[in-house]
A protein has these predicted regions:
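ATP-binding pocket architecture of kinase catalytic cores
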Residues: 22-180, 184-198, 212-214
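Juxta-kinase regulatory segment immediately upstream of eukaryotic protein kinase catalytic domains
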Residues: 1-23
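Active-site Asp-x-Gly
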Residues: 197-198, 204, 210-227
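Aromatic/pi-system hotspot detector in well-structured domains
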Residues: 11, 55, 203
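Tryptophan-centered motif/residue detector
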Residues: 10-11, 163, 184, 223
Length: 227
């Protein structure tokens, strides 16, 4: 879907502080369930992340939840981009919900084996991943205003139930082996220990932006499945 650059430029000048004239809109082409674009102005760069057009599964593509959690983590040890604005209704140039965040120039590694770097660098990258994950799970959800971000109760049961429903809504044919997998998962759910922490939901190497010259993570992305 092509975006009306003139209309979007006028809209963002109203809603994003210090937004100047929009020069170009470039769609990121790799692995985005929510369409994501780089916006280049005369003075800066931004990222626009939107719900896809058309009919969507209930609770899928929750860019408003992404915006909320990224904004809440702004002053924590978890590296996230700055967010500037959420268009939380359809009365905008895209006709669907989207948000604007900071563009972070850095490195993204798509292959988990990271063959393009040496062993020491690879070790450093994965150490940074472990550190950010520990920082995330140490966030006090009450202090950052996310006490109501997730639903109460057994997380494992909720996740299993959610994905079973998503599968059954979107399946095309009967798959007996999938029913066996579902039964196995439902019979083997771990007991909920009552501990609560923030979960990213899609924590993997290519959802992170690394500093250009070090193994430091400068931005953890794609919070669509966070809870």
């Amino acid at each position: 879907m092509e975006i009306d650059k003139i209309a979007l430029n006028s809209y963002l000048k109203i809603h994003v502080d210090n937004f100047d004239s929009l020069v170009s809109i470039e769609k990121f082409g790799t692995g985005q369930s929510n369409p994501t674009y780089k916006l280049t102005t005369h003075k800066s760069k931004y990222v626009l992340r939107a719900k896809p057009p058309g009919e969507l599964l209930k609770s899928a593509h929750a860019v408003d939840r992404e915006y909320r959690v990224i904004k809440a983590l702004k002053n924590t040890d978890v590296a996230v981009p700055k967010v500037y604005f959420l268009a939380n209704d359809n009365d905008n140039p895209l006709g669907r919900m989207f948000y604007i965040m900071e563009y972070l120039p850095g490195r993204i590694f798509w292959d988990p084996s990271v063959p393009e770097v040496d062993k020491a660098t690879r070790t450093g990258l994965y150490h940074s991943m472990c550190q950010i994950l520990a920082d995330l799970h140490s966030v006090d959800i009450n202090k950052v205003g996310l006490s109501d971000f997730g639903k109460p109760g057994n997380y494992f049961a909720r996740q299993t139930d959610r994905w079973v429903k998503q599968y059954r809504i979107s399946r095309l044919n009967e798959e007996p082996v999938m029913e066996k997998v579902i039964s196995f998962l439902e019979d083997c759910l771990p007991v909920d220990d009552g501990q609560i922490s923030l979960v990213h939901g899609d924590y993997r190497l290519d959802n992170m932006i690394f500093d250009k010259n070090s193994t430091k993570i400068i931005g953890l992305l794609d919070w669509e499945l966070s809870t």
